Amino acid sequence: MNIYRYEENPLITPLDVKPIHEGFEVIGAFNGGVAEYNGEVLLLLRVAEKPVSEDPEIVLAPVYNAKNKELELQSFRLDDENYDFEDPRMIRSKAKLEGFSYLTSLSYIRIARSKDGHHFTLDEKPFLYPFNEYQTFGIEDARVTQIGDTYHVNFSAVSEFGVADALVTTKDFENLEYQGNIFAPENKDVLIFPEKINGKYYALHRPSLKSIGNLDIWIASSPDLRSFGDHRHLLGIRPGEYDSGRVGGGCVPIKTEEGWLILYHGATEENRYVMGAALLDLNDPTIVLKRTKTPILEPVADYEKNGFFGDVVFACGAIQEGDTLHMYYGVADTSMAGCDMKISEILHQLEVEAK
């Protein structure tokens, strides 16, 4: 399959983003949801800011205080035997077998705008910043689904309660209406379908399991995009394949004559992230028709292989223009990149590899 990576890649890097917090540095501008509005391409970037510690023996963790509406810093000494600091992204309590106690950065959503889809200008202020007790550790990985003239923006809400998926709606990317948490912890990678199917809304989601099971994609339906039920398993991991470790939703589902085209991320046990594709039935998206056996996009460029967390391509959105798909994706948990691919070629790969 032919893939055209933009010559301007990476399109946005941490160096392009000025931190909004004094004494912080931007360590990531990545995993942006995508929308078209008012003649522009909008990237709803996840911006990760990390507090700079003046003492090399102290690690700082930013926490949003939902009661007083202020950002606070927790301090931890590296010689504190109660905590594990091996992963630079988080602080783990040794008393907990899994998960983390704090993050070393705070993420929020900031919009980058472009007239041509290649050159972007960043808004100075956040589009979404933590505002309640379910977002005290940050807001991550937005996806945007347009239904009529309303844009539904869902995102991971991270706090001491876990990772939930929350929803806001907007018509102009200025005025927002908070719709609440639509999936309870532990859940992420939610993709809302852009239209009703047989009178129901549908969404893909990825529960994160603690005891048994795998990190697989599920599907649920809803009468109103607020209350989701009828949860069903949809796409699982595949031992020995590019998605043997985990799978999760990527871009908002794309309607084609052959079915709903799903572009999802898959990772190995070694955390090499690629993009794969699947085709769901047009009238019953709980039915998987086909699935790629090889990735449609994988980390090969230097900016995809090297960064804060290397060997990662992670798409959260795309824009369809006829048969061309303009896909924007996070690279190495650091920056944003873009590429063009043909929908017909993805469908052809699905057809060939289904045999």
Swiss-Prot record:
Single GO term (MF): glycosyltransferase activity
Transmembrane annotation, as ranges: none
Keyword Phosphoprotein attributed: no
Reactions the enzyme catalyzes: beta-D-mannopyranosyl-(1->2)-D-mannopyranose + phosphate = alpha-D-mannose 1-phosphate + D-mannose
Keyword flag Transcription: no
Pfam families found in the cross-reference section: Glyco_hydro_130
Enzyme class of the recorded protein, top EC level: transferase
pH dependence statement: Optimum pH is 7.0 for phosphorolytic activity. Optimum pH is 6.0 for the synthetic reaction.
Stated role: Catalyzes the reversible phosphorolysis of 1,2-beta-oligomannan. In phosphorolytic reactions, prefers beta-1,2-mannobiose (beta-1,2-Man2) as substrate, but can also use beta-1,2-mannotriose.
PANTHER family with a match to the protein in the record: GLYCOSIDASE
Protein name: Beta-1,2-mannobiose phosphorylase
